Amino acid sequence: VIWSYGNKTIAPYSEQFYVGGANSIRAFTVRSIGPGRFHPAENSTYSYVDETGDIKLEANLEYRFRILSSLFGGNLNGAVFLDAGNVWLMRKDEARPDAEFSFNKFFDSIALGTGLGIRYDLSFLVLRLDWGIALHVPYETGISKYYNIPRFKDGMGIHFAIGYPF
């Protein structure tokens, strides 16, 4: 949680929290989820702004397993993961409805993603490739089920990174 003080009502952008990307909820691009259940309309003022918040809650579960040993001096490992979380605002923002934290909407405002990954471990360097699949987005999509991704291809994220995600 970040709380601005003094005469400021919002924390500096560089200090705000975000979710999504290679080290967060891997089914989504970086800073594309939240805050809360807010989702900018296409071509609106906020459609090109990275989404950040004052509160962050994130959980990651990952099972890693060996695929091949001693492959060109390293080990090839696999991973299956489940990521969940979101960011919220501390104060109500009229320009971004449903962006503030609310216990009543808590479970519906959690983004959920799963996926598979490959890790090449050289013991001094880990290269990884993750393929994330979105299961739930916190905003309204017109689908009333918990799996509310309109099209499968819209709910995928591929990330290449160095090092483990956590």
Predicted feature residues:
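C-terminal outer-membrane beta-barrel translocator/porin domains of Gram-negative envelope proteins
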Residues: 1-75, 80-105, 140, 144-146, ...
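Transmembrane beta-strand segments that form the barrel wall of outer-membrane beta-barrel proteins
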Residues: 45-47, 129-135
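Transmembrane beta-barrel architecture of outer-membrane proteins
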Residues: 56-60, 111-115, 155-157
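Repeated loop/turn-to-beta-strand initiation elements of outer-membrane beta-barrel proteins
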Residues: 68-71, 120-129
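Conserved active-site loop/cleft motifs that coordinate metal ions or position small ligands
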Residues: 79-81, 126-132
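Strand-loop-strand
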Residues: 94-122
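A carboxyl-terminal module marker
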Residues: 113, 128-130, 153
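Outer-membrane beta-barrel "beta-signal"
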Residues: 122, 152-166
